[in-house]
A protein has these predicted regions:
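N-terminal ligand-binding/catalytic initiation module
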Residues: 1-107, 346-354
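Flexible, glycine/charged-enriched surface loops at secondary-structure junctions
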Residues: 23, 60-69, 92-94, 129-137, ...
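Short, surface-exposed connector motifs at secondary-structure boundaries
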Residues: 60-63, 132-135, 222-225, 244-251, ...
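General beta-strand structural signal in soluble alpha/beta enzymes
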Residues: 64-68, 92-96, 140, 163-166, ...
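Glycine-rich phosphate/diphosphate-binding loop of Rossmann-like nucleotide-binding domains
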Residues: 105-223
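Adenosine-phosphate binding glycine-rich loop
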Residues: 124-125, 243-356
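Rossmann-fold NAD(P) dinucleotide-binding segment
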Residues: 211-224, 234-251
Length: 356
């Protein structure tokens, strides 16, 4: 409900450079609505999606603009939007990504952003610190698609994830977040409060938003090796950054778009904490969207292993591109500057070659 034109323009600008870092032939745009799905029935959400597409369809196309899901928009909503698009245009093409697999979606699209975040983190830690995620304690914020799949992949790599959060509060589970419980609370449109986790899992602690540390977020006030902000913009403050540093955190890897406040980034970098901006580390989602577009265009279906392999390779390439650019411009290990310079150069060079 807080979406406005200013936010969308800013995110569209960022999307251009995120897409640029992938090296894939995609531009960048953003769209959205201030419709709040909380408390709405499936039928009400479907009605809205259909009405939205009736206004949107003339501005999008497989070779024009291909919208994808984001906050509040998952496979269900994409399905409603795509169904209305087909009814209006009678076209079956790759005009939306993140579609259900049954009619044109790609395997791994729901997992792509979260998995990509972890693949980027693993590559960065391996190259910069000769470390792995196995056996490491990690903090994650959020309980949406990106956060849940970030937690899932971290656990698959042997990490112990001890936090997750929603708009009402944060769960800390020292034995490791039980994804089955979180999905029971948040899955299939349930969207129940994470407070229910504490009643189901003995030993876990729930902190309501009203009880958060002054100027901070409870998810970042526990000891961890790496932190993964995966919820929303400006969720990790300077206060949080100071606490992470105090607790021995060595890396912060953004899963959400711009979740870390600028003064927090400055502090983390000054203290030697590896920091990856979202335009680099969360590019996995848009990458697999492009994979989906490629499959739609060629009328193919890739198997899971192929998509996963290509995603891992692409995230490693993004890390390498960002890291080498940072070194080239005298700002080694500054992945913010490295990402911005690498992305801007590719866009600028393309514009010059096209005579823009």
């Amino acid at each position: 409900p807080s979406v406005d034109t200013g936010i969308l323009k800013f995110l569209a600008f960022e999307q251009i450079f995120k897409n640029s870092l992938t090296g894939l032939p995609i531009g960048g745009a953003k769209g959205g609505s201030d419709f709040d799905p909380k408390g709405k029935s499936d039928f009400e959400i479907m009605k809205f999606c259909r009405a939205f597409m009736r206004e949107l369809y003339q501005y999008i196309g497989a070779r024009v603009d291909v919208p994808a899901g984001d906050i509040g928009v998952g496979a269900r909503e994409i399905g409603y939007l795509y169904g209305e698009y087909k009814r209006i245009t009678r076209n079956y093409d790759g005009v939306l990504s993140g579609k259900p697999y049954e009619f044109g979606g790609s395997l791994m699209r729901p997992q792509a952003t979260g998995y990509g975040v972890v693949y980027f983190a693993a590559e960065m830690l391996s190259q910069e610190l000769q470390e792995t995620l196995e056996g490491k304690t990690c903090c994650v914020s959020g309980a949406g698609n990106v956060a849940l799949h970030t937690i899932e992949k971290l656990q698959q790599m042997g990490a112990l994830v001890v936090t997750c959060s929603d708009s009402e509060g944060t769960i800390y589970d020292p034995r490791g977040i039980d994804l089955c419980v979180v999905r029971e609370l948040k899955g299939n449109g349930a969207r129940a409060s994470l407070e229910g986790y504490a009643t189901r899992v003995p030993g876990s602690v729930y902190t309501a938003k009203a009880d958060y540390p002054a100027g901070g977020h409870a998810a970042w006030h526990y000891p961890c090796f790496a932190a993964f902000p995966c919820a929303t913009q400006n969720e990790l403050s300077r206060t949080d950054a100071a606490k992470l540093i105090e607790n021995g955190c060595v890396a912060v890897v953004e899963g959400a778009n711009m979740p870390t406040e600028p003064d927090a980034i400055e502090l983390l970098q000054r203290e030697g904490v590896l920091f990856s901006p979202g335009k680099a580390s969360n590019a996995g989602g848009v990458a697999v969207s492009e994979f989906e577009m490629s499959q739609n265009a060629s009328m193919e279906k890739w198997d899971y292993d192929k998509v996963d392999r290509k995603l891992q390779e692409l995230m490693a390439q993004i890390y390498k591109r960002v890291s080498l650019t940072a070194k080239e411009y005298g700002c080694e290990r500054n992945f913010v500057d490295g990402a911005n310079i690498a992305a801007f150069k590719r866009v600028a060079e393309a514009m010059i070659l096209e005579g823009v």
